[in-house]
């Protein structure tokens, strides 16, 4: 037995390593202690057996066939370095510049003497504001509502300060594309709309926050002198208004002393949309925002605003949809089939759905623009357009393509909105007009055109659809706008006259000695100059701008329902409710990856950026063209590009073009908080742009991509003092560094990126790099070079882009090494705070690994496979280990320590429930916000305005995608309007009938009328559940005896059945026809043989359902023809072809005769029936049998159909006492029961079970059902062995209750029993007898949750019992699998699949009915076979195979015959690639 994995010693909080740093002498002396141990085998490690189980010979025991192949043996010596300190390296000044660390924004208290010269009140206010700002949440996420004394009385969490957010920034003032925004802005008393939002969701709460962060920034980095001079000059002019703004903003809080006359709804709307004061609510209507989708929400019409609110939660961790699609390559037009998974904002595709850690590719839908069906004829092809490229897909059916498109549209729409709700606030004074439009046939729609703000008067359009109250709502809106328009005109005229009078009076005061004529002339000239601009009288200054979390439709959009109508605008960059933790686009990624598409935002946003620049500069900045401090997170060349694209460069701009003359932009952060990580800012220096100018081809570059955040240029005394606070002791070290590493100075001054040779040499040199080292490891000086070069943020952006991870993912370290799968593959390892990733670097390879840290169990250090390499084994929960190799032992040790620390941190956060705190709080606050609005609506007079759904849209094929306020709601409801008479036809044992009882109970709950047609002995059981019963002839006991003696449906079975059961088959067919009459839908186990013909006769939809694979696939062999060894995809596929042909040829004569005589149908054949096109429901879990890659879209793996009967079952007192005694004795408790299996010698099997239980030293609950079935006639009764006290015999017990009481289960391996034991999360021992039991035994063993016995006897069974109760690895894997199975609801999934595929099933029946009308009974018609059938020059011919098989005496079901398929068939490479 190999020693247990050795975990490295962890000390300190969250598993922080205790690392000691010394000088060169200590580094040279460090030695790692090496221990030797064997490499883990890739299969489940064997547990050392006790001596009592080692003794004994099992050579005479019964061999159970088919058996599995021999386990692969691996011998890998392991070496473990126990000293963590040995992995560290000496830290000196030079080493700090070589490594890369994330910056910290929490070093504010470490201020120099110059900072402390500020007044104590200012400094104290700064600290108070800084702490308060951390606690504030942005409105983009949610409004944390105050307690309403007049409302529901729900407890409030905390009071928000409205000024903390300046809700709803001006839409045109926001960038087209996200970017990291500088916080050094002029802090003026400006309206709430005059601040842009941050591209990464880090919106500035208000100007004072920006100034505070400005102070914070300068404390954490050492800027070059030029940059600090510019910074000081810029800060001076901001200082006076800065102080005023802070004072005023601190006083501006929402008080609950609002006017008592204000309604609860008005106060809620004030909170959510941040009005200056509560506004009277005129009307409220349920409506739908119409863009590329329909979004359900509510419109609130107040005295001054038209507001729209919709609850739209994110689904970051939820798998929205999964299934198979075909995808064409970027350069290869051929379609390849993959398994796709739409999770969160990422569409991933895999070659193997069971290995979700290795995606073949990913599509980040945060960059998505549109998704649409392109093939209008067949409706199978659709595309997804992103900023980077267009992806082409093909579905198996038109409904599947439409479902995928709608799901993708929903995700794209959600990702373009910031936060968990959509909020739009349209000031009534900004509205131009309201127009009735006929956009939808089933709803009243109005178009509202609004002026974005009073800078450029850009026009936006919003479309709202009403399924009820539409005429009334539009009428109210029109009346309101007309009244507001007339009032505004009068106010504008009065204001203009008043301003002119004030101006003349002011001139008289300034020039008292001036002759009246000259003064009058001057004033008249000045007045005429103003009079030239007509907007003075017609377009007065608007009090506020349009505010929204979602980009509007452009007024120049050719079609409001264009796929790009809402996506042309960038992500939610118009988001005035900007979130602090943005989980969307990142500017640097846009700049690098999609520069050619940067002009997609159009010129309007470019103008709005210029407006914002001019607006923010204010009167103090208009005359200045001096440079402003620039801080960029981009490559050095980007800053210069922006400057040159706007104007001729001045000297100051030339200096700004190089990052060495800029403020460092990164601060190392020891915190994983996204709020701190995203304080990476950039500033864009430009001269004041002309109002409403168009930048042409630089629209996105000069406009939406740039912040335009200008700084005043007048220096202040405080900032000049700060400038001199540069620690002189650091200057010498910096100079030494420049002398010793002069080659790197060029990279700091130059604007071009790293060369190809430098990149490649660094890649092959290997090594490691840390991005988030603890503060005790690196000093404050270390981030100087890193920040100046700007590499940290770039590395994090590239890491997230490589693996399509959210922006909350924070890179911690990278390593170069090899991953070992088939051959060593060189690549790069990434460790973040939530994931462990790998990316191959060899040309021609695209291997990626994305492994969540929560799925990793442990990390072991071993010797490598190759000489001189050091190995690392990542042990994954419920998955095989993954092996890595490193060229250097210290790199391997560093990787192990970092990964173990991250694991400990993750486990600790998960334990205290703090792993996803931010996301959870966002969701809870959004729900509270939604509930508060709902409650306020109910108390108003608008409670009768309920949502009316457009039910007629179900028949509109081109209706837009619909998003519901309820995240679980869906318009994709295929439920039939009328209840159906559904018949389930099956034969076999109790395990074959039980799943149908569970399904029928679900159908009963849906309002349908189910019926089960099966053997008569199950009548009472079925009717006991309130289900109708219909009898089908046949004796399941005799059928089981035939299967055990001859194998299940083997040639020997069919040959004997033909000789002995001809009458039985005729009776089965006739009784099945009688039992199914009057049905509207037929669901059949294919072993019943009659259903497909009955459905054809009745012209009703037909489904198949079974407990084991019956559909042709290369992934698994047919469950009735399991080989002794794994034979590969070609053999697996041929087992289905062979079985279909043998099974049909053995019964074709009787079936066709029955069709002619009873059903009055012509003869048929396999080609005409096309059984593999029938929709199929598999009632097992995808976690047990992963859906094969070559399953068609109509083949569904729904999950187990469990019939839980244990809730009302009362266990006998003897049983509960036995269980309690076993627990008291601290003995393992197992269940042994082989169901209703027929055995030749019941006494012998019982004695073997007794001996095995005693040898394994366990307690056993025995269900001895095998002795209760029929035996051979004429045999004398044999005395049964006496049961020892360690065994308690029961007649029966519900599996769901019993398996929850025990430690392991041993049974025959039937599908239902296997599912029950796996759902309980306990190891499973399978002793297969016949049929699918061998298949499920192999699956249980393959996934590592149990044992499939190869031999049967007391010794083998005792060893299995002991291992199942003592193997920790197996126990943990079984527990994990149990959690996954319990999360499924197989019955509900099956019912939804029936609804979804109903039309497809009807189309098959109609097609067959049409053929029968035209075809004569004996005509041999050629029909098209399934399009997914694999055809190749090496594929065996099915007819020839059938002919050969008919000449064989028996098939692999018999124990005395060598299994079929021991010859490996030659297959083409194309066929192997599909397997």
From Swiss-Prot:
Please name the GO terms of the biological process aspect recorded for this protein, alphabetically: autophagy; carbohydrate metabolic process; lipid glycosylation; protein transport; sterol metabolic process
What GO molecular function annotations does the UniProt record carry, in alphabetical order? sterol 3-beta-glucosyltransferase activity
Query: Which InterPro entries does the UniProt record give?
Result: ATG26_PH_GRAM1, ATG26_PH_GRAM2, EryCIII-like_C, Glycosyltransferase_28, GlycoTrans_28_N, GRAM, PH-like_dom_sf, PH_domain
Q: Give all residue intervals belonging to the GRAM domain.
A: 270-315, 798-901
Q: Which reaction does it catalyse?
A: a sterol + UDP-alpha-D-glucose = a sterol 3-beta-D-glucoside + UDP + H(+); ergosterol + UDP-alpha-D-glucose = ergosteryl 3-beta-D-glucoside + UDP + H(+)
Membrane topology designation = Peripheral membrane protein
What is the superkingdom listed in this entry's lineage?
Eukaryota
Compositional bias of kind Acidic residues: 1416-1425
Task: Show where the PH domain sits.
Answer: 318-413
Which residues participate in UDP-alpha-D-glucose binding?
Answer: 989-990, 992, 1293, 1295, 1308, 1311-1313, 1332-1333
Instruction: Kindly state which keywords UniProt assigns to this record, in alphabetical order.
Output: Autophagy, Cytoplasm, Glycosyltransferase, Membrane, Protein transport, Transferase, Transport
Q: Tell me the null mutant phenotype.
A: Leads to delayed autophagic degradation of peroxisomes in the appressoria.
Biased composition, class Basic and acidic residues, residue ranges? 108-118, 675-686
Composition bias of kind Polar residues appears in 621-634, 653-674
What are the subcellular locations of this protein? Cytoplasm; Preautophagosomal structure membrane
Q: Say what the protein does.
A: Sterol glycosyltransferase responsible for the glycosylation of ergosterol to form ergosterol-glucoside. Mediates autophagic degradation of peroxisomes (pexophagy) and is involved in pathogenesis via peroxisome degradation inside appressoria that are developing into the host invasion stage.
* Description of its domains: The GRAM and PH domains are infection-related pexophagy.
Question: What family does this chain come from, according to its entry?
Answer: Belongs to the glycosyltransferase 28 family.
Stated name of the protein? Sterol 3-beta-glucosyltransferase
């Amino acid at each position: 037995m190999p020693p247990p994995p050795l975990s490295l010693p962890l000390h300190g909080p969250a598993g922080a390593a205790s690392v000691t740093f010394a000088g060169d002498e200590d580094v040279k002396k460090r030695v790692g202690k090496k221990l030797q141990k064997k490499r883990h085998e890739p299969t489940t490690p064997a547990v050392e057996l006790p001596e009592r189980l080692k003794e004994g010979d099992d050579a005479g025991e019964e061999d159970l066939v088919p058996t599995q192949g021999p386990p692969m043996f691996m011998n890998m010596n392991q070496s473990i370095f126990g000293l963590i300190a040995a992995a560290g390296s000496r830290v000196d000044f030079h080493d700090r510049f070589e490594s890369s660390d994330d910056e910290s924004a929490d070093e504010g208290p470490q201020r120099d003497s110059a900072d402390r010269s500020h007044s104590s009140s200012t400094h104290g206010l700064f600290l108070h504001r800084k702490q308060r700002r951390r606690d504030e949440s942005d409105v983009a996420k949610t409004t944390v509502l105050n307690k309403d004394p007049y409302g529901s009385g729900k407890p409030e969490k905390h009071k928000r300060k409205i000024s903390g957010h300046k809700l709803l920034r001006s839409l045109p003032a926001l960038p087209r594309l996200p970017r990291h925004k500088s916080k050094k802005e002029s802090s003026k008393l400006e309206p709430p709309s005059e601040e842009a939002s941050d591209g990464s969701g880090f919106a500035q709460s208000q100007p004072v926050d920006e100034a505070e962060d400005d102070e914070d920034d300068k404390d954490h980095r050492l800027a070059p002198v030029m940059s600090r001079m510019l910074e000081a000059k810029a800060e001076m002019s901001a200082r006076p208004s800065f102080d005023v703004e802070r004072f005023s903003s601190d006083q501006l809080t929402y008080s609950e002393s609002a006017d008592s006359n204000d309604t609860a709804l008005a106060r809620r709307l004030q909170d959510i949309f941040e009005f200056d004061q509560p506004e009277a609510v005129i009307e409220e209507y349920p409506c739908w925002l119409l863009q590329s989708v329909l979004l359900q929400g509510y419109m609130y019409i107040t005295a001054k605003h038209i507001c729209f609110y919709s609850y739209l939660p994110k689904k970051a961790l939820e798998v929205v949809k999964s299934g198979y699609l075909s995808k064409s390559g970027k350069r290869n037009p051929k379609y390849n089939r993959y398994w796709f998974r739409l999770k969160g904002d990422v569409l991933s595709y895999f070659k193997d759905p069971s290995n979700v850690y290795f995606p073949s590719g990913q599509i980040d839908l945060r960059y998505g623009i549109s998704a649409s069906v392109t093939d209008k004829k067949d409706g199978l092809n659709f595309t997804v357009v992103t900023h980077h490229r267009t992806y082409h897909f093909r579905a198996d059916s038109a409904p599947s393509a439409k479902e995928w498109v709608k799901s993708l549209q929903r995700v794209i729409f959600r990702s373009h909105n910031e936060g968990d709700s959509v909020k739009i606030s349209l000031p009534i004074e900004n509205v131009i007009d309201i127009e009735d439009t006929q956009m939808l046939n089933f709803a009243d729609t109005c178009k509202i055109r609004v002026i974005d703000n009073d800078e450029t008067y850009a026009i936006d359009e919003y479309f709202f659809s009403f399924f009820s109250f539409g005429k009334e709502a539009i009428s109210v809106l029109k009346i309101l706008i007309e009244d507001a328009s007339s009032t505004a005109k009068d106010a504008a005229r009065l204001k203009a006259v008043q301003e002119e009078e004030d101006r003349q009076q002011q001139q008289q005061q300034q020039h008292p000695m001036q002759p009246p004529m000259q003064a009058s002339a001057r004033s008249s000239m000045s007045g005429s100059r103003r009079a030239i601009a007509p907007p003075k009288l017609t377009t007065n200054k608007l009090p506020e701008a349009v505010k929204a979390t979602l980009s509007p439709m452009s007024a120049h959009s050719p079609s409001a329902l264009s796929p790009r109508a809402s996506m042309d605008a960038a992500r939610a960059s118009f988001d005035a409710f900007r979130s602090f933790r943005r989980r969307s686009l990142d500017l640097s990624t846009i700049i690098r990856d999609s520069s050619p598409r940067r002009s997609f935002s159009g010129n309007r946003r470019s103008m709005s950026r210029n407006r914002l620049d001019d607006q923010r500069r204010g009167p103090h900045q208009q005359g200045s063209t001096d440079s402003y401090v620039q801080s960029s997170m981009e490559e050095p060349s980007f800053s210069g590009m922006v400057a040159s694209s706007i104007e001729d460069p001045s000297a100051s701009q030339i200096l700004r073009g190089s990052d060495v003359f800029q403020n460092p932009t990164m601060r190392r952060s020891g915190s994983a908080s996204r709020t701190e990580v995203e304080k990476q800012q950039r500033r864009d220096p430009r001269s004041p742009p002309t109002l409403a100018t168009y930048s042409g081809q630089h629209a996105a570059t000069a406009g939406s991509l740039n912040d335009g955040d200008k700084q005043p240029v007048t220096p202040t005394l405080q900032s000049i003092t700060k400038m001199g606070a540069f620690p002189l002791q650091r200057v010498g070290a910096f100079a030494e560094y420049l002398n010793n590493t002069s080659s790197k100075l060029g990279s700091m001054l130059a604007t071009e990126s790293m060369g190809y040779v430098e990149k490649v040499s660094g890649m092959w040199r290997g090594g490691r790099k840390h991005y988030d080292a603890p503060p005790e490891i690196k000093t404050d000086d270390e981030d100087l070079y890193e920040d100046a070069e700007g590499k940290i943020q770039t590395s994090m952006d590239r890491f997230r882009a490589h693996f399509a991870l959210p922006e909350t993912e924070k890179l911690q370290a990278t390593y170069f090494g090899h991953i070992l799968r088939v051959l060593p593959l060189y690549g790069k390892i990434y460790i973040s705070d939530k994931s462990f990733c790998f990316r191959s670097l060899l040309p021609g390879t695209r291997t990626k690994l994305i492994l969540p840290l929560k799925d990793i169990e442990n990390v072991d250090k071993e010797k490598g496979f190759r000489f001189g390499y050091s190995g690392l084994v990542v042990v994954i929960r419920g998955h095989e280990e993954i092996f890595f190799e490193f060229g250097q032992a210290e790199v391997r040790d560093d990787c192990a320590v970092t990964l173990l620390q991250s694991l400990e941190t993750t486990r600790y956060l998960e334990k205290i429930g703090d792993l996803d705190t931010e996301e959870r709080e966002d969701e809870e606050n959004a729900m509270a916000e939604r509930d508060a609005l709902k409650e306020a609506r109910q108390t108003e007079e608008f409670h009768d305005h309920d949502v009316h759904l457009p039910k007629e849209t179900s028949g509109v094929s081109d209706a837009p995608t619909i998003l519901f306020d309820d995240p679980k709601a869906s318009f994709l409801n295929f439920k039939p309007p009328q209840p159906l008479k559904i018949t389930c036809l099956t034969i076999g044992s109790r395990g074959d009938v039980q799943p149908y009882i569970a399904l029928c109970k679900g159908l009963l709950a849906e309002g349908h009328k189910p019926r089960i047609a099966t053997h008569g002995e199950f009548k009472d059981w079925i009717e006991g559940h309130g289900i109708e019963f219909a009898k089908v002839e046949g004796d399941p006991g005799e059928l089981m005896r035939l299967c055990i003696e001859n194998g299940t449906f083997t040639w020997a079975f069919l040959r004997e059945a033909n000789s002995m059961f001809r009458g039985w088959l005729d009776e089965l067919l006739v009784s099945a026809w009688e039992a199914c009459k009057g049905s509207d839908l037929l669901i059949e186990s294919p072993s019943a043989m009659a259903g497909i013909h009955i459905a054809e006769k009745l012209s009703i939809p037909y489904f198949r359902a079974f407990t084991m694979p019956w559909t042709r696939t290369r992934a698994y062999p047919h469950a009735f023809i399991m080989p002794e060894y794994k034979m590969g995809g070609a053999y697996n596929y041929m087992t289905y072809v062979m079985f279909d042909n043998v099974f049909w040829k053995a019964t074709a004569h009787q079936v066709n005769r029955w069709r002619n005589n009873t059903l009055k149908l012509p003869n048929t054949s396999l080609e005409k029936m096309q059984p593999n096109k029938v929709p199929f429901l598999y009632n097992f879990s995808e976690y047990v049998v992963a859906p094969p890659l070559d399953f068609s879209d109509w083949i569904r793996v729904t999950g187990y159909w469990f019939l839980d009967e244990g809730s009302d079952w009362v266990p006998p007192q003897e049983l509960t006492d036995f269980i309690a005694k076993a627990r008291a004795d601290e003995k393992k408790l197992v269940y042994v029961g082989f169901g209703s299996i027929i055995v030749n010698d019941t006494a012998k099997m019982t004695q073997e079970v007794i001996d095995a239980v005693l040898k394994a030293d366990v307690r056993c609950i025995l269900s001895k059902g095998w002795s209760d079935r029929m035996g051979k006639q004429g045999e004398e009764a044999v005395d049964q062995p006496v049961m020892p006290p360690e065994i308690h015999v029961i007649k029966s017990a519900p599996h769901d209750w019993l398996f929850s009481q025990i430690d392991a289960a041993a049974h025959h391996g039937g599908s239902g029993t296997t599912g029950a034991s796996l759902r309980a999360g306990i190891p499973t021992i399978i002793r297969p007898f016949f049929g699918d039991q061998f298949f499920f035994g192999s699956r249980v063993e393959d996934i590592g949750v149990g044992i499939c016995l190869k031999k049967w006897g007391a010794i083998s069974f005792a060893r299995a019992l002991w291992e199942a109760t003592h193997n920790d690895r197996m126990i943990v894997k079984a527990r994990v699998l149990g959690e996954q199975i319990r999360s499924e609801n197989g019955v509900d999934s099956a019912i939804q699949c029936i609804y979804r595929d109903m039309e497809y099933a009807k189309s098959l029946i109609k097609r067959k009915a049409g053929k029968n009308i035209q075809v004569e009974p004996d005509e041999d018609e050629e029909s098209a076979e399934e399009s997914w059938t694999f055809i190749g020059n090496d594929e065996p011919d099915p007819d020839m195979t059938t002919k050969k098989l008919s000449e064989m005496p028996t098939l692999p079901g018999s124990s005395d015959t060598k299994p079929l398929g021991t010859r490996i068939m030659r297959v083409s490479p194309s066929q192997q690639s599909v397997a």
